[in-house]
Amino acid sequence: MKIIKGINDKNKNDIVKWTNEKGKDFLEQWAGKNADFPLTVSQIDNMNNIYSIFCENEFIGIIQKIRKELDNIHIGRFLINPELTGKGLGKRALLEFINLIFQEKDVNSITLNVFDYNVGAKKLYEKVGFRVVNVAKNPMKKYMMIMKKGEK
């Protein structure tokens, strides 16, 4: 598993294809409420700090460092090729990304949000060590989860 900052044009087109084939709900599930369907390359261009995920040199997805607040990094927009889910690749990619982030000396925690209906993603996050710290109910129920450096 390899994670590299940035995304090339071919891989942007893969993200657009995977997403638009799955539909509007799938886009919202990984990109949030502010993404417009159908997804376009220009929307991906507007996402800062995107990282490409590769498995055996094959592009399989993306993940984003959304923002840094003090000693915390908030992550999101985590997407694995839908044809490859259920094979443990998401877990491996997420663990690799967590390791990459925690190598930064001034980072002590990672947070993310996950919609209530995205049960599989929430289970994955809990499996790798995230825990729920807050629940927001408006406009849709979502969980804020955290992982602290050194915790599991």
Regions found by a protein language model. Give the residues of each.
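A conserved short alpha-helix in the GNAT/GCN5 acetyltransferase fold that borders
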Residues: 85, 94-102, 126
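Conserved active-site alpha-helix within GNAT-family acetyltransferase domains
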Residues: 91, 116-134
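Acetyl-CoA-dependent GNAT
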Residues: 2-83, 100, 104, 136
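A short, internal acetyl-CoA/4′-phosphopantetheine-binding micro-motif in the GNAT/acyltransferase core
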Residues: 78-89, 114-115
